Regions:
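Bacterial N-terminal signal peptides
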Residues: 1-8
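Predominantly soluble domains enriched in secretory-pathway, periplasmic, or organellar proteins
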Residues: 8, 12-175
């Protein structure tokens, strides 16, 4: 009997996943109840309806109240947009540079780390932006390698990692 209760408790929880469709300027919210997956919401994102702005990276803050989305292609620059998880409405945004791609939020500091995967022009050294999500302002840019992609924080939130695709370098940033 106890096994059934544990099984039921574990598998009766609903899980939500946010999925960005980069070529369609939409984000789908998927709900998994332990048995099936259904789309509960489809959110149109971007600023200009006639331009593909490319939603790319998504992260949810530790409180679960907000989610953040990078619009990688932008006009002329990309941005990070802050949304409410309650109604999936945009709350604020910060314009960044060319092609902000992957994004993570530190559970320790609450800061956002945004990696630039610049596909425009010559391959050159890129950056990771540190953004204050409360005020949606860029605090600093940290120089990395050429075309960094991927963004991960250590489980304790102390370090941010990204890899520069063109140089094969791994960058560790004190978060």
């Amino acid at each position: 009997f106890l096994s059934f209760l544990i099984f039921h408790t574990v598998f009766s929880q609903d899980y939500y996943v946010y999925v960005a469709a980069e070529s369609d300027d939409q984000v789908s919210v998927l709900k998994f109840d332990g048995k099936e997956i259904i789309e509960t919401d489809r959110i149109s994102v971007g600023i200009m309806p006639t331009e593909n702005e490319g939603p790319h990276g998504i992260t949810i803050d530790p409180s679960g109240k907000y989610w953040y989305l990078t619009l990688a292609h932008g006009s002329p620059n990309g941005s990070v947009v802050k949304y409410s998880t309650e109604n999936n409405e945009p709350l604020s945004k910060v314009e960044l540079g060319l092609f902000p791609a992957t994004i993570q939020i530190s559970k320790k500091t609450g800061l956002l780390y945004v990696v630039y995967f610049n596909l425009h022009g010559l391959m050159k050294t890129s950056t990771v932006s540190v953004v204050d999500p409360e005020y949606m302002v860029e605090i600093t840019k940290i120089k990395t390698g050429i075309m960094p992609h991927g963004s991960r924080l250590s489980p304790d939130g102390n370090f941010h990692y990204s890899v520069a695709m063109m140089s094969g370098e791994l960058f560790e940033i004190d978060a």
